[in-house]
Amino acid sequence: MRPLSPSEGGGWVRVLSIVALAAIWELAIWAFEPNHLPHLSKVAEAFWELATTPGPWSCHRDTNLFWEIISQSGLGCNLGFTLFRAGAGFFSAMIIGSVIGILLGRFRSLDRFFDGWIVLGLNLPALVVGILCYVWFGLSEFALILALAINKVPLVAVMVREGAASIQPELIHVAKAFRLSWFQTLRKVYLPQLYPYFMASARAGLALIWKIVLVLEFIGQSQGVGFQFQIFFSNFEIEKVLAYTFSFIAVVMLIETFIMRPMDRKATRWRM
């Protein structure tokens, strides 16, 4: 018999893994109070209630039932707010961090001068950055997105810097010999070499941003998943906390499965 490839049967393995996790969850309830660790059926009921109950505000109206649930429910709107903030902070940090990383990787004098700044940025607590941004710019969307970008830029810059520094000088000389413009050199020389580093920084940064955005919403916003966690924590509604958690994780896994993994496979195709 031909052995299964990693892609074949992988779906069944993931399903069995989720079923095993659900079984462990139900068994763990025996050791805890149901109020502290509710049954999955209670979490499902809380999810349906949150998904079908309108929040204090609505995004927009739609006649389609699916989009009605997404846009008119508190769950759908809060997920939308959080995803927008995370996406804005992510793309801002990727652009700024990539530019900084390329410059540091190609110009050693800049790298030596700003190396201490990068180390400081990498070790600066995310919560401190968030509090300072809220103090300086108010409890606004701009302050939250700025805090997300500041926390992620050093990570992107470090990874892209390593890629830019590893580009062979001969390739740059060839580009100059063929009199390529700076844009053509960037597109034909730098970007193909840096693509794996872009993907590594994107995946690492995305994992970081998902965690930070919830904390910043918890302490300084009036919409979003983090803000809902604050309300449910105050009311000790554990099943609703878990309902929002599983919903958020599901969205993150969809992004990872259908966007990040295909792009990552493209980045590492040359290794096959």
PLM ranges: what are they?
Residues 1-19, 257-272:
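Transmembrane alpha-helical segments of polytopic membrane transport and secretion proteins
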Residues 2-3, 31-91:
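Periplasmic/extracellular loop-to-transmembrane helix junction in inner-membrane transport proteins
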Residues 76-84, 111, 118-121, 138, ...:
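Alpha-helical membrane-interface segments at transmembrane helix boundaries
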Residues 84-118:
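Transmembrane-helix boundary motif in ABC transporter permease subunits
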Residues 115-152, 162:
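Generic hydrophobic transmembrane alpha-helix motif, especially the helices
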Residues 146, 150, 182-216, 239, ...:
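Transmembrane alpha-helices
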Residues 155-201:
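Short cytoplasmic-facing helical segments at TM-TM junctions of multi-pass membrane proteins
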Residues 225-263:
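Hydrophobic alpha-helical transmembrane segments of polytopic membrane proteins
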